Amino acid sequence: MPHMPATGVSGVDLYTMDCNGQQYWCAANYQFGDTVRYTYNDLTYRNTHDKGNEFTLYLPLYNGVKSLQIGVPKGSRFDFVRPSVEKPVVIYGTSIAQGACASRPGMAWTNILQRKLDMPVVNLGFSGNGQLDEGFFKLLAEVDAAMYVIDC
């Protein structure tokens, strides 16, 4: 996609949350080739939770992930956060909702919204296909959402 940076199309984005609920972007060194590699150094931050750091990893906006490896320092714990029981915000739209032209996955407006609201977001943005199809709206009606956002 010549109009988007490789970090948006194929990259990942990592954010951490402090004990006050404030989220911060974690800068990384990255390499793009046959394999995309991100290296994060010194991911210790002030004001952490009692149990350590909490991170959110945003996956590529356009390219799929066939394999993902996450390494942690020896002696560290790695646990997944339990899925939220809160009803999600469901977003239906076109390429802009999908994340087109965002510089990084975390900068797609849907992911910014998720961080600002601190609630789950289901992103149903499809490049070239946000056509307000009746059948799709019937499927949307089956989702128990806190709110629907239609961006077409």
What is the meaning of each model-derived region?
Residues 149-151:
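Structural motif
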Residues 143-147:
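Short acidic/histidine-rich motifs immediately flanking catalytic phosphotransfer sites
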Residues 1-88:
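N-terminal secretory targeting modules
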Residues 48, 55, 59-142:
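Serine-esterase "nucleophile elbow" of acetyl-processing enzymes
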